[in-house]
Swiss-Prot record:
Residues 429-588 form the Helicase C-terminal domain. This is UvrABC system protein B. It comes from the Bacteria. GO terms for molecular function: ATP binding; ATP hydrolysis activity; DNA binding; excinuclease ABC activity; helicase activity. ATP binds at G36, V37, T38, G39, S40, G41, K42, T43. The beta-hairpin motif is involved in DNA binding. GO terms for biological process: nucleotide-excision repair; SOS response.
Length: 664
């Protein structure tokens, strides 16, 4: 079923890792972990496991950038099978919200990317119709999508010779989300011309031309979407829905009645509580929505009524991509130390935002049920899971029936040497090291604790003739990737930043990583973070890490010991097999789907830092500090280090304010 194509055979630790993981799957192990160091070929190992067990697979990545990279790698490994891409279809997303302290209602505002919509629909079709499928997805895959049973029931089967007339086909197309138009370049549309219907699905590039003779299908052809030339003649075809959420007239009527019932119950509650403003607001808004649903079959924010359309009970999980798979599909959670905390936090973040909308009469309580899955629901809807990371979290390690190590790199590259140097004169020392790197035609990364330090250090390096840029949270995904492209091309010599783990992209030109203030204990200098940062130089033969510190913290000690352990294993392997290490060679263009990444994927799994700062107006200083501290640790656990740093700075500022007021 799966046919893996590669010029390489598994080497190093890959063969034993593949064997153990496949054996674990065949023995029915529910949870396994692949602990693979940077550059050890974890994606190739995953591809081999998929090919060996011949089962559909879902690979979940923590962000769009990494998902795009994985998608391309799997496409190359499986050119004859279906590899699909399923991420949030928003280029820009501002969720609906209400801020009581300002009496400010924010309407939902979003730009939808048609290319991603097409890829999502292609994913749903592939997963429902074949088994040789690998889907690469972001954490958006646990958000609601349409009922898979409706997707199956409402497709249109046509064959040459079928008795159906043009208008009946047009009516059936409209029922599954296609719109009639003359613009043939639009996906999800169809056009009528005499006895011919041309259909442009959202799930494929080719159009479909159906020609009639009276009330009989005379011919079916695939056509080029733009010049409309014939590509292939077909005897039969299945036309799948154009949109994720589809409904029947019967379901619509049932949903409207159910919404009315819930509205009456909620209005009764608000009346008893004496909430007259909320009563009138909810009544007016919901009745307007009902009128639109009855006349147009649609209303703004229709997703907030999804429970009524699906016939779900309050609290029941929504349908998601997971429900489209066969029951035996495998899940790989890539960069699990980041992705698992995201999956855990998304439900709470969504519910906290909707709480005000429901309490203040903007939405019915059923809006809570248009939501992502809880982590427990996610585990119930999945079967066997393989966590993949260079630094798995405690959860993954504790729950896994086996942890498979992949330490040896096929390239022979060893983990970099780690030096600890004093902070006195650290900037001058750093400059000298960067100059050496520059002379070799290589690059450097410098990680610091604050955005301000990153900015000042980058400016200082530039003044000294070193081409430097800094990464910061105001840059969106494309701008961040552009900075890294410049680094790889040699347009800049060094990149300075607070969180250099965010992209997770391969940077083989980087031979030096400098960690400033390495002994300042906290989330930015934890064992996991330090190991991840050290791994940034693991693709270059001259890789070196310098930690500037005046003492060795426990986190530093453990990170250095683990790095040295991995070095020993690789060096012994190289000696035994006569391998000479070589740097990774990778095409200069960092292949990322830029058309998908105009804006950063909305980080919908928690409150934004900005909204947290708004709480200062309604909380006492002590309560506000407690919230800041809690959110800081949550952001750190999810490796959102820039958010965590901003919250930390605000926490320090409030503490200083309190001290001044108390005269301390």
């Amino acid at each position: 079923m799966f046919k893996l194509v590669s010029e390489f055979e598994p080497t190093g630790d890959q063969p034993q890792a593949i064997e153990k993981l496949v054996e674990g799957l065949n023995r029915g192990m529910r949870f396994q972990t692949l602990l693979g160091v940077t550059g050890s070929g974890k994606t190739f190992t995953m591809a081999n496991v998929i090919a060996r067990v011949n089962r559909p697979a879902l690979v979940i990545s923590p962000n769009k950038t990494l998902a795009a990279q994985l998608y391309q790698e799997f496409k190359a490994f499986f050119p004859e099978n279906r590899v699909e891409f399923f991420i949030s279809y928003y280029d820009y997303y501002q969720p609906e919200a209400y801020i009581p302290t300002k009496d400010l209602y924010i309407e939902k505002n979003a730009d939808i990317n048609d290319v991603i919509v097409r890829m999502r629909m292609s994913t749903l079709k592939s997963v429902r119709t074949r088994r040789d499928v690998v889907v690469v997805a972001s954490v958006s895959c646990i958000y609601a999508t349409g009922d898979p049973n409706d997707f199956d029931r409402m497709n249109i089967n046509l064959a040459v010779g079928d008795r159906i007339d043009v208008l009946e086909l047009a009516e059936r197309l409209a029922r599954i989300g296609y719109q009639r138009t003359e613009d043939v370049s639009l996906s999800g549309c169809f056009r009528l011309k005499g006895d011919t219907v041309e259909i442009y699905p959202t799930y494929q590039d080719e159009g479909i031309r159906i020609e009639f003779f009276g009330d009989e299908v005379d011919s079916i052809t695939l056509i080029d979407r733009f010049n409309r030339t014939t590509l292939e003649h077909l005897d039969k075809i299945i036309i799948y829905p154009a949109v994720e959420f589809i409904t029947t007239e019967e379901k619509l009527k049932r949903a409207v009645e159910s919404i009315r019932e819930e509205l009456n119950e909620r209005l009764s509650e608000l009346k008893k509580q004496g909430k007259i403003l909320e009563y009138e607001r909810l009544k007016q808004r919901t009745l307007n929505d009902i009128e639109l649903l009855e006349t147009m079959g649609y209303c703004p924010g229709i997703e907030n009524y999804s429970r009524h359309f699906d016939g779900r009970k309050p609290g029941e999980p929504p349908y998601t991509l997971l429900d489209y798979f066969d029951k035996d599909f495998i899940v790989f959670i890539d960069e699990s130390h980041i992705t698992v905390p995201q999956l855990r936090a998304m439900y709470n973040g969504d519910r906290s935002r909707k709480k005000n909308l429901v309490e203040y009469g903007f939405r019915l309580p059923s809006a809570y049920d248009n939501r992502p899955l809880t982590f427990e629901e996610f585990l119930k809807k999945t079967g066997q899971i393989i966590f993949v990371s260079a630094t798995p979290g405690d959860f993954e390690l504790s729950i896994s029936e086996q942890v498979v190590e992949q330490i040896i790199r096929p390239t022979g590259l060893v983990d970099p040497e780690v030096e600890v140097r004093p902070t006195a004169g650290q900037v001058d020392d750093l400059v000298n090291e960067i100059v050496k790197v520059k002379e070799r035609g290589e690059r450097a990364l410098v990680t610091v604790l604050t955005k301000k330090t990153a900015e000042l250090l980058s400016e200082h390096l530039t003044e000294l003739g070193i081409r430097s840029l800094y990464l910061h949270s105001e840059l969106d995904a494309i701008e961040r990737v552009e900075v890294l492209k410049k680094l790889r091309r040699g347009d800049v010599d060094v990149v300075v930043g607070v969180n250099l783990l965010r992209e997770g992209l391969d940077l083989p030109e980087v031979s030096l990583v400098a960690i400033m203030d390495a002994d300042v204990e906290g989330f930015l200098r934890s064992e996991t973070t330090l190991i991840q940062i050290i791994g940034r130089t693991a693709r270059n033969i001259n890789g070196k890490v310098i930690m500037y510190a005046d003492r060795i913290t426990n986190a530093m000690k453990r990170a250095i010991e683990e790095t040295n352990r991995r070095r020993r294993i690789q060096l012994e392997y190289n000696k035994k097999h006569g391998i000479t290490p070589r740097s990774v060679i990778k095409p200069l263009e960092i292949e990322v789907f830029e058309q998908f990444m105009v804006k950063e994927e909305p980080e919908r799994y928690g409150d934004t830092v900005k909204n947290i700062f708004e709480m200062k107006k309604t909380l006492s200083p002590e309560e506000y500090m407690a919230v800041l501290e809690e959110e800081m640790y949550r952001a750190a656990s999810e490796l959102r280090y820039e958010d965590a740093a901003a919250l930390r700075d605000e926490l320090f500022r409030i503490r200083e304010e309190i001290k001044k007021k108390k005269g301390l």
